[in-house]
Amino acid sequence: MVHFTAEEKAAITSLWGKMNVEEAGGEALGRLLVVYPWTQRFFDNFGNLSSPSAILGNPKVKAHGKKVLTSFGDAIKNMDNLKTTFAKLSELHCDKLHVDPENFRLLGNVLVIILATHFGKEFTPEVQAASQKLVSAVAIAL
């Protein structure tokens, strides 16, 4: 189990409260699919994923990205109990969809990049460290 300090929790919660989940979620999933094209195989029912512009403009990518970031919101509310929080999603993604757990780590890293682009100077090294810790813990839980 990962332990988050009060400062880490505060930094993550504060940043998350300012996040546009719909916008950032679409960007994060879209970037994952562009940068790591082998991840597209899990989204063959999303239609046109033939180019970066097609992926980033795809409404299904945006909708699923929002769903993914909404789940990250659940993680923020339950930082001390991530394994239980993600038990059902873990079962779905690993046991039924056979998603390589490495893909969750990649998505977490992409999300940290999105946070940095959205929050600029507010995304200090301390906030980055806390965010990286959270996305790594979520990847492990999944």
UniProtKB/Swiss-Prot annotation:
Keyword ATP-binding included in the entry's annotation: no
Organism: Callithrix geoffroyi (Geoffroy's marmoset)
Modified residue annotations for Phosphoserine: S14, S51
Quaternary structure and partners: Heterotetramer of two alpha chains and two epsilon chains in early embryonic hemoglobin Gower-2; two zeta chains and two epsilon chains in early embryonic hemoglobin Gower-1.
GO MF, one annotated term: organic acid binding
Family note: Belongs to the globin family.
Keyword Phosphoprotein included in the entry's annotation: yes
Keywords for this protein: Heme, Iron, Metal-binding, Oxygen transport, Phosphoprotein, Transport
Domain Globin: 3-142
Function: The epsilon chain is a beta-type chain of early mammalian embryonic hemoglobin.
Protein's recorded name: Hemoglobin subunit epsilon
Tissue: Red blood cells.
UniProt xrefs under InterPro entries: Globin, Globin-like_sf, Globin/Proto, Hemoglobin_b, Hemoglobin_oxygen_transport
GO BP field: hydrogen peroxide catabolic process
PANTHER family from the UniProt entry: HEMOGLOBIN FAMILY MEMBER (PTHR11442), HEMOGLOBIN SUBUNIT EPSILON (PTHR11442:SF7)
Binding sites annotated in the UniProt record for heme b: H64, H93
GO CC field: blood microparticle; haptoglobin-hemoglobin complex; hemoglobin complex
Protein origin, superkingdom: Eukaryota
